Structure formats: C-alpha cells, structure tokens
Amino acid sequence: MIQVLLVTICLAVFPYQGSSIILESGNVNDYEVVYPRKITPLPKGAVQPKNPCCDAATCKLTPGAQCAEGLCCDQCKFIKAGKICRRARGDNPDYRCTGQSGDCPRKHFYA
C-alpha cells in the first residue's frame, strides 16, 4: 500500500514527458523518497550488439549453434558436462553444467 502511494505521489509531483520511466527504489519504507528517472534510449543510428548465435530476423539459432546464452553456453556451444556454473550455497552442492543445455540447472534432484 505504501509503495503504491509513494509511486502515485511521486508521479504526480515529478511528471515526465514520455511513456516509460523507471523508479529508483530499493525497499520502500515510510522515510524513503522515490525519484523517477527517464529511460535512456539508444542514440540515433546505434544498434544493439548482435548475438552471433541468434538470427534476429527469424528468432532462431544460427546454423551450427546449440545455444545463444546462459552460464553453460560458450561461443554458441554447450559447455562440457561437469563444469561448475554456480558455486554451492549452504548445504547444496555446486551446480554443474549438464552438457545438454546452455542454462545452469536450477535445482538438484536427489535419487
């Protein structure tokens, strides 16, 4: 409720031209002031970096590519099974690439 109220007040007091704003805010509490900030568009003529693993026109992987991103993807190929992609936390063991996906596994499954 407080977050919605602060955002509403903030937008009313600090209106900006344009359709998109980002609110700079962490944990909103009674004493925090939330300030809006404009989204900075790319300069005219600039293009976002091209991903060599992905064909932007078709939204598909390029020929020979196995993956386009992820902690277990390197140069469009799956990283070998067993490579640590995320270190252990608490009682969980290290997370390791499977060799079958560009993504690092989310959970461990025990038999």
From Swiss-Prot:
Belongs to the disintegrin family. Dimeric disintegrin subfamily. GO terms for molecular function: toxin activity. It comes from the Eukaryota. GO terms for cellular component: extracellular region; plasma membrane. Pfam families: Disintegrin (PF00200). Disulfide bonds join 53-76, 67-73, 72-97, 85-104. A motif (Cell attachment site) lies at residues 89-91. Residues 45-111 form the Disintegrin domain. This is Disintegrin subunit alpha. Keywords: Cell adhesion impairing toxin, Disulfide bond, Secreted, Signal, Toxin. Its main location: secreted. It comes from Agkistrodon piscivorus leucostoma. It is found in: Secreted. Expressed by the venom gland.
